From Swiss-Prot:
The keyword Transmembrane applies. GO terms for biological process: transmembrane transport. Putative transporter. InterPro entries: Sugar_P_trans_dom (IPR004853), TPT_transporter (IPR050186). GO terms for cellular component: Golgi apparatus; membrane. This is Solute carrier family 35 member E3. GO terms for molecular function: antiporter activity; nucleotide-sugar transmembrane transporter activity. The chain crosses the membrane at residues 17-37, 40-60, 77-97, 100-120, 130-147, 153-173, 187-206, 225-245, 252-272, 275-295. It is a multi-pass membrane protein. Belongs to the TPT transporter family. SLC35E subfamily.
Amino acid sequence: MASLADRVRGNGRIAAGLLLNLLVSICIVFLNKWIYVHYGFPNMSLTLVHFVVTWLGLYVCQKLDIFAPKSLPPSKLLLLALSFCGFVVFTNLSLQNNTIGTYQLAKAMTTPVIIVIQTLCYKKTFSTKIRLTLIPITLGVILNSYYDVKFNFLGTVFAALGVLVTSLYQVWVGAKQHELQVNSMQLLYYQAPMSSAMLLVAVPFFEPVFAEGGIFGPWSVSALLMVLLSGVIAFMVNLSIYWIIGNTSPVTYNMFGHFKFCITLFGGYVLFKDPLSINQGLGMLCTLFGILAYTHFKLSEQEGSKSKLVQRP
């Protein structure tokens, strides 16, 4: 009975963690879009707030022994911290200048770009099945963008830059974690303050600081509360992802990611009244099919590799 009770409590914790991640992951997209649409808060300044709040949150976490910080040489993290800035800034600019549907589908192009980077730069090979899944993913994104009535060139440029820098960042994070033998929270604990310092230097060159529309400009209390809430939720997204990866299987994490993908698309059209054509809907279904197929084949290959290792004498 005790073991049954423990399993029930464990499943309850996992369900609560998944629910929290679902809520904050969807909320951060809609809240940021709301801040851009209704308050016009500057993009890089919002990203800076996110980084500072994330670092403060991680500082509290390590004081509470949620994770143990590891001493890392800053010189080895400079490029990673810079790409972290670029990935968040360009992703937020894509959200600011595109519909939520186009923003969300553009992010799906990260997978094909990562595969191209790893193939060309790291000589990594992928099976034919994996490579074929890139066709529906890419085709769906192109279909959606082509038939998006709110399509704009600037939004497309930001989306493309966001995908490229995000892909580089994800590849480098994996390489750095392996090289330095650290987990994602230990790495982020050093990245966040370094990225904050970089943005602190860059913001005055691209955005007003004390004038109207700047981070220290005359904002309403509601705008400041929304920005602070956005920073807290951004931290909770990172924390909940770390917890889910550590307490569930890769299948659970990936399938849950697809569920969030669909909910975010649906919520964008409901909350922001973005128009949706039949061709856009087909593009979304095409991309979702490609993502599901990629996940299925990737996880099957990983399980096959584990089985071979276990059977090896």
